[in-house]
Design a protein with these regions (language model features):
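A short, conserved structural fragment
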Residues: 95-109
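Eukaryotic partner-binding/assembly regions in large regulatory complexes
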Residues: 1-16, 125, 129-133
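Short, amphipathic alpha-helical interaction segments positioned at domain boundaries
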Residues: 117-146
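Short coil turns linking two alpha-helices in DNA-binding domains
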Residues: 85-86
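Short alpha-helical segments that sit at the start of domains
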Residues: 14-63
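Basic, amphipathic "hinge/linker" alpha-helix immediately C-terminal to the N-terminal HTH DNA-binding motif
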Residues: 109-119
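Short acidic, hydrophobic short linear motifs in intrinsically disordered regions
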Residues: 61-81
Length: 146
């Protein structure tokens, strides 16, 4: 008897929140991170929000140190604590954004994937490709139960 491997080949967390209304840009990005599982509810270590915000605002390729410097400036200007700004954590959060296809690495710099609109990225990369594959596999398991 073959024992199946319980390690997922792909995994995604999606959450539904209230409709957006009169929110700051940072709060909208925070909701996107919460909705796509990049940020956990109640998590105060939200540097991923600032990374995403900075890459969206700058619309250019930035290296890790430039991103980190921009995070420090942004958090200081908004009087937010400097939690989670270690270079290793910034790189880890960039990797998570890359895994969700929002960010791509070009040489040693990062940018929004193909400088594309986020709605298009979500529809093309996550909805049609990533989510479709997961749903198809769940259906395979359901069909096997017949």
């Amino acid at each position: 008897m073959k024992v199946s491997n319980d390690r997922p080949l792909a995994e995604i967390t999606l959450r539904k929140y209230e409709k957006p209304y009169e929110m700051s840009r940072r709060d909208l990005i925070r909701k996107i991170c919460l909705s796509t599982g990049l940020l956990q509810p109640g998590d105060s270590r939200d540097v991923i929000v600032d990374i995403f915000y900075i890459l969206l605002e700058n619309k250019k390729e930035m290296n890790c140190e430039e991103i980190r410097g921009a995070i420090i400036n942004k958090r200081n200007s908004e009087k937010l604590p400097l939690n989670g700004i270690a270079a290793s954590n910034v790189r880890r959060q960039l990797r998570r954004l890359r895994e969700m296809y929002f960010v791509e690495k070009v040489k040693n710099t990062y940018r929004i994937n193909e400088n594309e609109n986020l709605t298009n990225l979500f529809e093309q990369k996550i909805e049609k490709f990533y989510l479709h594959g997961i749903l198809a596999r769940v259906k395979d398991y359901l069909r096997e139960l017949k």
